[in-house]
């Protein structure tokens, strides 16, 4: 399963808090969910649910997590990079 984390408009998207319910019902190869919370524990729970489902099922092959703001984006990106990413990003040099 591929997971994309990006920022964008979440107005018409289902909440990521419903991931456990929506993953089995996903039609096709992708599912897009809205991430509104910038809380690290919430981001971890959603990503853990997505990955646990992905380990056991072929579909959806891609999950897009659209974050409402910078705080949510940072929380989801941090948890993804910390626990799930195959390769860790290079540290940014603050020169």
Annotate each predicted stretch with a short phrase.
Residues 15-95:
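Phosphate/ribose-phosphate-bearing ligand recognition and processing surfaces
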């Amino acid at each position: 399963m591929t997971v994309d984390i990006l920022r964008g408009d979440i107005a018409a998207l289902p909440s990521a808090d419903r991931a456990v319910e929506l993953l089995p019902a996903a039609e096709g190869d992708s599912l897009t969910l809205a991430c509104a919370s910038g809380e690290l524990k919430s981001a971890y729970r959603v990503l853990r649910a997505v990955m646990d489902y992905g380990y056991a099922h072929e579909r959806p092959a891609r999950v897009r997590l659209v974050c409402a703001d910078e705080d949510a984006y940072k929380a989801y990106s941090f948890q993804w990079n910390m626990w799930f990413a195959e390769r860790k990003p290079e540290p940014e040099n603050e020169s």
